[in-house]
Regions:
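Helix-loop-helix hairpin linking two adjacent transmembrane segments in secondary transporters
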Residues: 25-78
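Helix-to-loop junctions at the C-terminal end of transmembrane segments
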Residues: 171-183, 269
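Cytoplasmic helix-loop-helix junction between adjacent transmembrane helices
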Residues: 1-28
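Extracytoplasmic gate region of multi-pass secondary transporters
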Residues: 111-173, 227, 231, 261
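A membrane-interface helix-boundary motif in multi-pass transporters
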Residues: 45-57, 267-285
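C-terminal transmembrane helical hairpin of 12-TM major facilitator-type secondary transporters
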Residues: 184-233
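A late C-terminal transmembrane helix in Major Facilitator Superfamily
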Residues: 235-274
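Juxtamembrane intracellular "pre-TM" segments in multi-pass secondary transporters
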Residues: 76-123
Length: 305
């Protein structure tokens, strides 16, 4: 998924449009969970749980058809791209290549060296991992927090758990436009982290349960501003030939750290029985990621070094 996303956007979009392109691609990560909960509940109630699988299978056919018939590896290979569009893409995009001879086969090791030996890749991994740890922790434990600590019924927890994804959708759209307009990816990621941390900190200390849930959800949604920036930065620092493997490595390692988050939260709860302590740890992780983001706001010319 992420290797394909980053490769297509790297090859098809000028640098000044990649923020919006990445946003458009990943909007489904916020839109789908927000819609899936009530929709799948209705399908199960009206039909059966098996029908959710039939419905999911039907949905996957649409992108398969669109990708197979209307896209290609490069815009030069696509019959639907006209000359003016092709000129705009080629003029606005600076292509970095590993070899001048395009027929020469590039080894896996050589591709990996391009990003693994780039310090910016590891800084970006730190930012993405902090975001992933927040996301996985929230998806796993937010419903329990709202039920046990805030006293919401499970019926109310259902729609409240969708709030972070709704806010996330709005913040992703905003980030995509800001990134393409200003090219300040590092600063956008930093502001996103600070807004997230401040909102969660405020939310856990608000006595009104309803407003607390909204403020916490707002903060979690604000963290979504980092995602278009992460992928746009990756596409700026890695040549097209290594894009797919770099995206896979970045996402794979970030998901690995993210998967530790629910386990870490569960362990802390078993020892402290204190959800506030868990929230403060998540806030700390987000702030650390935000501080790493500042390194990208210092000097944008160092991305390809």
């Amino acid at each position: 998924y992420y290797p394909m996303q980053n490769t297509i956007i790297k090859n098809w979009f000028p640098a000044g449009e990649r923020g919006r392109a990445n946003t458009a691609w990943i909007l489904g990560q916020s839109l789908a969970p927000a819609l899936a909960m009530p929709l799948y509940t209705w399908i199960i109630a009206e039909h059966s749980w098996r029908h959710t699988f039939y419905f999911s299978f039907s949905l996957t056919l649409l992108p398969i058809v669109l990708i197979y018939f209307f896209t290609s590896n490069f815009p030069q290979e696509n019959k639907y791209v006209n000359v003016l569009e092709l000129q705009k893409i080629n003029k606005s995009t600076t292509e970095e290549v590993l070899h001048k001879n395009s027929s020469e086969k590039i080894s896996v090791v050589e591709r990996a060296k391009v990003y693994l030996c780039n310090s910016n890749f590891w800084i970006l991994l730190a930012v993405f991992s902090s975001n992933s740890m927040l996301s996985w922790g929230v998806v796993t434990w937010l419903p329990t927090y709202l039920n046990t600590e805030r006293g919401f019924s499970w019926a109310n927890v259902g729609w409240m758990s969708a709030l972070p994804f709704i806010f996330g959708l709005l913040f992703k759209v905003l980030a995509g436009f800001i990134v393409d307009k200003t090219d300040r990816k590092g600063m956008v990621m930093f502001v996103s982290a600070m807004l997230c941390a401040a909102s969660i900190l405020t939310g856990v200390n608000i006595s009104n349960n309803f407003f607390a849930a909204i403020v916490i959800s707002f903060g979690i949604g604000a963290s979504s501003m980092q995602l278009p920036c992460v992928f746009t930065l990756l596409q700026s620092m890695v040549p097209a030939e290594a894009m797919s493997s770099a995206a896979g490595a970045l996402n794979g390692m970030a998901v690995g750290f993210g998967a530790l988050s629910p386990v870490l939260i569960g362990f802390i709860l078993s020892v402290t029985h204190n959800f506030y302590f868990v929230m403060y740890i998540l806030i700390g992780i987000v702030v650390i990621g935000g501080l790493f983001s500042l390194l990208f706001s210092r000097d944008r010319s160092r991305l390809l070094n």
